Curated annotation (Swiss-Prot):
Any Gene Ontology CC annotation: cytoplasm
Organism ancestry: Archaea, Methanobacteriati, Methanobacteriota, Methanomada group, Methanococci
Known cofactor(s): Mg(2+)
Cofactor note as given: Binds 1 Mg(2+) ion per subunit.
Gene that this sequence comes from: purA
UniProt-recorded name of the protein: Adenylosuccinate synthetase
């Protein structure tokens, strides 16, 4: 039995979707549970050459043997949830998903408030998905819960009970975190942050398990960190420099161009300490050095690629166990058992 939490080590967009999908296929967890804020964070999952952009359904959906869960701590937009369940019909998501009946519900009024609030939309760079205003209502105890919404009633249940029972039965459980540690309401670059905490301890609470149940925390870092929206970015490079390096990306939810920077070892060390990270996953190593593209054996990485990994391990103090060298699941180096 292993309970693994995957967290973003930067400002989101680290490539958690790819790492989560790989772990779900490799480790075959019985439950893949989603923690985090809500539908304000997007993940892109590629299956057999087809890309799926999702915001509510856990990114481990390609593993058709696993139950998919959305924890009580996750804000749920029924419209987005139902749309994604239909989009992923061939993966039988509708029969496998369990949404906690205590989850908070995002309504149209929350989205309208999010988009019309000048402070949120212009100064902070909110995604406009209604999460901030919904969390305000939750704090005021006026927010609807999943049990109050008929359209999703057939998907509702007790996620905490399901996850704890799976762990007690000796099954593997994977908990997906969203966004990134540096967007945490408590530990990020306030006020340019999201509307709740985005670290491992909070993700565990989101799905209803205690801290002693957690075995592994995988912190995901992109070789070139990116950020959408406003806020400090200590190692940010110019847009022209990013273009020269071939690093041009756009946000899954907002469509806005991502700001790009160089790897920040000091911030990475703080993030790993904050999350109690037991291992690191590095994504987009092929963007750092194109000679690393598609490599699946660590020893066959270029010297430049190996030097990057070694520097991360030495300066951050946590072992790099997973390395993504391309968008496909098989384009992954896994040294967890070495």
């Amino acid at each position: 039995m292993t309970c693994t939490i995957v967290v973003g080590g930067q400002w989101g967009d680290e490539g958690k979707g790819k790492i989560i999908s790989y772990l779900c296929k490799k480790d075959n967890p019985s439950i893949i549970a989603r923690g985090g804020v809500g539908p304000n964070a997007g993940h892109t999952v590629e299956v057999d050459g087809e890309k799926y952009g999702i915001r509510m359904v856990p990114t481990g959906f390609p593993n058709v043997n696993a139950k998919l869960a959305v924890g009580a701590g996750v804000l749920t937009d029924p419209e987005v949830l139902i749309k994604e369940i239909k989009m992923l019909e061939k993966f039988n998501v509708g029969e496998r998903i369990l949404v906690d009946y205590r989850c908070g519900i995002i309504e149209e009024v929350h989205k309208e408030l999010d988009k019309s609030n000048e402070h949120l939309s212009k100064e902070i760079g909110s995604t406009g998905t209604g999460c901030g205003p919904a969390n305000v209502d939750r704090a005021m105890r006026t927010l609807k819960q999943g049990k109050d919404v008929e359209s999703i009633s057939k998907y509702l249940g007790d996620v905490s009970e399901a996850v704890n029972e799976a762990l007690e039965s000796g099954d593997n459980v994977l908990i997906e975190g969203t966004q990134g540690s540096l967007l945490s309401l408590f530990y990020g670059s306030y006020p340019y942050v999201t509307s709740k905490d985005t670290n491992a301890a909070s993700f565990a609470a989101d799905v209803g398990i205690g801290p002693t149940k957690i075995d592994e925390v995988v912190a995901v870092f992109k070789s070139y960190p990116t950020r959408v929206g406003e806020g400090p970015f200590p190692t940010e490079m110019s847009l022209q420099e990013a273009e020269n390096l071939g690093v041009v990306e756009y946000g899954t939810v907002t469509g806005r161009r991502r700001r790009v920077g160089y790897f920040d070892h000091e911030l990475a060390k703080k993030v790993c300490r904050l999350n109690g990270a037991t291992q690191i996953a590095i994504t987009c190593l092929d963007k750092y050095d194109s000679d690393c593209y598609g490599i699946t054996d660590y020893e066959k990485l270029s010297e430049k690629g190996k030097a990057f990994i070694k520097e991360v391990e030495e300066k951050v103090g946590v072992k790099v166990t997973l390395i993504s060298t391309g968008p496909k699941l098989e384009q992954t180096i896994d040294v967890r058992n070495e």
